[in-house]
Each structure stands twice: as C-alpha cells, then as structure tokens.
Amino acid sequence: MKKRILSVLLLTTALAAQNEITVYNWGQYISDGTDDSMDVIKEFEAETGIKVNYLTFDSNESMYTKLKTGGTSYDVIIPSDYMVAKLISEDMLEPIDFSNVPNFEYIDETFRNQSYDPENKYSVPYTWGTVGLIYNTKYISEEDAQSWSCLWNSKYAGKLLMFDNPRDAFAIAESMLGYSYNTEDAQELKNAADLLATQKPVLQAYVMDQIFDKLERGEAWAAPYYAGDYLTMVEENPDLAFSFPEEGFNFFSDAMCIPKGCQNKEGAEAFINFLCRPDVSAANLDYIGYSTPETAAKEYMDEEVTSSPVAYPDPSVLERSEAFEELGIEATQTMNDLWLSVKTEGANTTLYLTLTLAAIAAVVAFFLISAAVTRRRKAKRCRKWREAE
C-alpha cells in the first residue's frame, strides 16, 4: 500500500513538473503588464497552460553561485555572454533542441554563433546592449560626463554610485587604464583594483538594482549602468542623461539557456520560443528598453525606441566598445580576491576611523567632565573657606 501511495505521489509530482517551469532572470528584465504593457508571463501561461515560477537575480555572479550551490531547480536562465561561456565550459547547460524553438529563425545572423557559444548549441539571444554613464544634468556637466573619471570626481563626493559586481567595476577601471576588459595579467588586475580603491572615498554606495530608486529620486547624481535601464529611468526623471565614455565601454549580449538539472526541458524550450516570436519580442523589449536581436521585431516597435541613439548606437560609437569573454580560473579568482579587498579594506578603514574618533570623543568628554567636576569642587571649597572667614 505504501509503495502504491509513493508511486502515485511520484507520478503526480512528475505531471506537475511538466505543467510548470521556473525562470531565473535579471530584475526588471521582462514586460510585466505595467503601464498597459504586455504581461509576457501571463500571455505565455494562457497560450500554453504552463505555469511560470519567476525568480530574479542582480548579477551574473550571484546567479552562478545559486546554480553551483543548488537548492532550486531552474528551467530557464538568462546570463550574459561571458557567463554563458563559463557555464558551457563547466558543463552546466543542456543543449537546446531547436526543433522546439522554430522562432529562432528570426534571430539575426549577426547575433548567432557568437564567441561565447560558437555553435549556438546552448543559447538563444534575448537582448543586447551597452554600459554607459547615467548622470543628472542638474548637478553634473555634460563635459564631465564624457569620461569615467567623473565617478572619481571629488566635486560629486557622496552622490556617486558604482557597480556592485567585480566584472563590471573592473571594466571601468580597465577602460581608464587602457587595458582590455579580458586581461588576465595579474599586475594589470592589481592596478585596476588600486584605482577602484581610490574611488571609494567619494562613493555613496555600491549598487545594482537599487540604482533605479537612487537616480530617479535624485539621491545620487551619477552611476554606470545599462543603456536599456537608463531608458526606463529617464521616464521617471527627465533630468537624467546618458553618455558613452570616451575611454570605452562594455557591449554585451544576454541569452536564454537551459541549465543542467532542469525539471521541464520541453516547457523551457516552449518559453524560449515564445520570447523569440517577433510580436512578443517587440512588446517585451519596447517595455524594458533593451535592444532586440531580431530585425523582424522592430516592425512592431515604437519608432522612438528603434531610432534611439542610446538603444541602437551608431556603428562609429560601438567601435569604442568591447565584449566580455570568459576569464580563466586563476584570473577570475584574482579579480574576486582583489574586489573583496577593495570593498572590505575600505570598510575596515572606515570602521577603524569611526572607532578611533569615538574613542577620542570619549577621552575628550572624560577630561571635560573631570575638569568641570574639579572646578565645582574648587568652587565649593572656596565657598566654605569664605564662610569660615
């Protein structure tokens, strides 16, 4: 009887898994029905009957850690180019059955067979974009905003934000030093870390998704971030502007993948296929502001978006960009260690200074109180002497 119950439970669980998928995506990276936009997930659920459990991450590194440590089974993930390459090299992705993704035909040739997945076995492009400097024109001049050095400018101390992930943060320092974003040279990585350390005194915070509120409300005046997100932020704060810094900037592609251990591969492929449909891609990317890898989708999109020099920069501008590639294990570890050092040493210094100042204040207070008590005692003795006389 127990075996029969267990068999029924296992069958029920298996059938349930076939009717749902878990999607792991960047925060604020899908059209969700807000402002009369398409609710992509609801539309997919209505068309297929497959329920979507939707979870978000704020960096490639945090997503990678989640996959490595396990605990949750994901069916679709959307990492960036260099992270796709890393996941492939570590045998963490399932090959995609493209017979279940016929809408792949709409992906432009330019975005197929990229270096991170040269045979296009494991990924389908979702979006592409760039990183630039978002700044508040009320406080920061256009001239200052043409260089990444703006983020080190003491004039704006306390109002500057920085990426809270090593790859993006190091890329900015590497731009300023004239290094490739894909350098594995230990000394160059150390030099980049040293430059990042000099930035810390002028920063308000290291952030990722928190950047939206901080820039939209004017709590911070400048930050490096993704062009697509800028197009969302500027709707909330028209004082914001975007620049492609003269030293260079990152060009990236994000792609849909299926991780090993997924529970519903066919459901995952159905979801990927749905997102590749031109009208869905158009509605989705029209809302999130990122650039589409499908020319066919542009026919459905707002011309204001497709003609935007931020979303679709001129080729002459893109010549200054560089894409991330997968770093070797040693270089990755070196970068992570240096990044930890940049963040924690500054924090320890701040803590040390705070404790030191508190100790000094306590000592000063002690002497002031002691002096006051002594004066009162002397005054009291003087009164007694006068009374005795």
What is the predicted function of each stretch?
Residues 18-86, 213:
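Early extracytoplasmic/lumenal segment of secretory-pathway proteins
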Residues 161-165, 169, 173, 181-245:
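Ligand-binding pocket segment of bilobal, Venus flytrap-like solute-binding proteins
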Residues 88-95, 112, 117-121, 232-244, ...:
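Ligand-binding "clamshell"
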Residues 94-105, 123, 238-250, 259-262:
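Short beta-strand->loop
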Residues 72-76, 94-133, 159-161:
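A structural signal for short loop-to-beta-strand junctions that line the ligand-binding cleft
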Residues 316-389:
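Conserved C-terminal helix/tail region of periplasmic/extracytoplasmic solute-binding proteins
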Residues 150-164, 177:
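Short loop->beta-strand "edge-of-pocket" segments that line small-molecule binding or catalytic clefts
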Residues 259-320:
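Mature extracytoplasmic/periplasmic domains
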